[in-house]
Regions:
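Electropositive polyanion-binding surfaces
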Residues: 8-172
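Boundary/activation segment at the start of structured domains
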Residues: 1-3
């Protein structure tokens, strides 16, 4: 077990080129992230969309380093987790956690995505887990997201939907 993972520079360059060449037109979803102020490893994002016939779609998009680092899986599993002390010690090399795999604003990225669809009665009518391409519209910190979106009609509609869903589960 080495303290630092060493990855071939050619592989890193190829992976950087790959994510750089992802086209926005190839992206299935436009997403946003919400993280603590100053975060560098932005590893989850979301999209909310109201579709026809009052169908609500929620997407949870998770950065997936294994898409790039399959050959390092054994070492990654032995490392176990990212450590947050007074200094962030990433599970994988910074170039991956803070760049290649990080869901950076105005970038296209590959993710593992969970797509859920609900009707207006909060019944889950569709679900899919898949690898997808996403475009990151905006990186928010918690305060900025709340200031810009929390009181918006659109976001309040989603809050009401989530409350109905939560209450329906309590009644079950």
């Amino acid at each position: 077990y080495q303290k630092k993972m060493t990855i071939d520079k050619n592989k890193i360059n190829n992976d950087i080129e790959y994510v750089t060449n992802l086209k926005k037109s190839d992206c299935e979803y436009n997403i946003f992230t919400i993280d603590p102020k100053g975060s560098k490893d932005l590893d989850d994002g979301f999209h909310f969309e109201k579709k026809e016939n009052n169908i609500f779609e929620i997407g949870i998009h998770i950065a997936c380093p294994i898409l790039f680092l399959k050959e390092y899986l054994h070492e990654i599993l032995n490392r176990c987790c990212t450590v947050y002390t007074n200094k962030n010690i990433n599970l994988i090399p910074d170039i991956y956690s803070e760049n290649i795999c990080s869901l950076l604003e105005k970038k296209n990225r590959k993710t593992m995505s969970i797509i859920l669809q609900f009707n207006e009665r909060c019944e889950c009518i569709g679900q899919e887990i898949k690898e997808s391409s996403v475009y990151i519209m905006k990186n928010y910190d918690y305060d900025t997201f709340d200031e810009k979106h929390y009181n918006s009609d659109r976001f309040q509609e989603w809050i009401q939907l989530s409350e109905r869903y939560f209450n329906s589960k309590l009644d079950s």
